[in-house]
């Protein structure tokens, strides 16, 4: 639980530090990142990194119809997809999986700083052991 709060704190700080005022003729720079799972502490199963089917870079864009190349929203910003992973509902997430995915995500986010916004695609209730 403490790790989750630490991660959220880091993301919020990165977001705030990375924000800048942009002139109206410059497109906003928006990062995309997120993880999602419904994990149950009552399940004996452990959820590993592979279960998230993590995507990186432009591969992420295909999951958002409103960001397809022909959609008008695609040209309204500069998009910087970092990492996105979604898992089926399962057991507690292993610490190794969580830390690996978070490190990849944070490294990807740091590459293109500063941002004007973050599309933080999260869902569920994640427990990490």
Predicted regions located by residue number:
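Positively charged n-region of N-terminal signal peptides that target proteins for export
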Residues: 1-6
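Bacterial N-terminal signal peptides
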Residues: 7-16
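Low-complexity, highly charged intrinsically disordered N-terminal segments
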Residues: 77-80, 84-88, 97, 101-106
